[in-house]
Amino acid sequence: SDLEDGHGKEYPVEGMPVSTNPSGTGYVDYVLWGRDGKPLAVVEAKKTMVEARAGKHQATLYADCLEAMHGQRPIIFYSNGFETFLWDDTFYPEREVYGFFREDELQRMVDRRANRKDLKAFEVDRNISGRPYQLEAIQRVAETLVKEREGQLRGGQRECLLVMATGSGKTRTSAAIVDMLTKCNWAKRVLFLADRTSLVAQAKSAFNEHLPELSAIDLTKEKEDPSTRLVFSTYPTMMNKIDGAKVDGERMYGAGHFDLIIIDEAHRSVYQKYRAIFEYFDCLL
């Protein structure tokens, strides 16, 4: 629901601990609803003078109540206007994010709970990437991204760095990683960043060859389409897309639009110069 029109504001929930509220009723600052009428996210808003994390416990209690009432656990947000934290407590620890997610981005996160598969068990397509060191690199990525807790599949680290020599098949390896993440339902949309248009074009061509079933665009030449699965871009082009707005004033890409960013040649200078991209998008890196 839109925060602007007041939908979801001060939503009453039942089942709060009596120690918190003798009546057992609580009032959630905001609930963001899915089209099926189930809660996608709960937002606990704190005053700017108060730390955002001060809302974590309260937001968790509200999520418990909403889950009991509607049969779906919402994504948890708490914010003071300066800092915003997201917590999908069924899978990941809390993390700071740029802002709130759009409805389709939240729905994707909730749906993923039921259909996400263990990356460590994935059989890599050796037609894409079959050299022993490539397979080991892919396996290490899987082991880094996945963590098990009490026999349950959970998310591990969200960032990986592969150090590979020129000619060792970096693009093939990254294509195989994308194949793994998409087929295991960890990623739907992927952003590939390079510092030159020629590298962007080469990468798109290679991914089209190895993953022809995934739609792809070169953002330096083609008009963006939000439904595209693979987006290839230079850093400045993507910076402009983040800073600019569509005709209706909304940004082209929400903070949760991409599930994975691949950086070609991840130098420290690149990260420092274009860190706004990585701070804006909440995704695997």
Predicted regions and their residues:
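SF2 helicase catalytic motif II
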Residues: G249-L284
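Short, well-ordered beta-strand core segments
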Residues: I76, V231, I261, L284-L285
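Short, solvent-exposed loop/turn elements at domain surfaces
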Residues: N240-I242, Y280
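Conserved motor-coupling elements within RecA-like helicase/translocase cores
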Residues: L219-V231, M252
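Short beta-alpha junctions and helix-cap segments that line functional grooves
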Residues: I177, I217-T220, D248-G249, Q272-Y274
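Short, hydrophobic beta-strand segments that form beta-sheet elements in well-ordered domains
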Residues: I76-F77, S215-D218, I261-D264
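ATP-dependent helicase/translocase motor core
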Residues: S1-R189, A194, S198-L214, P226-L230, ...
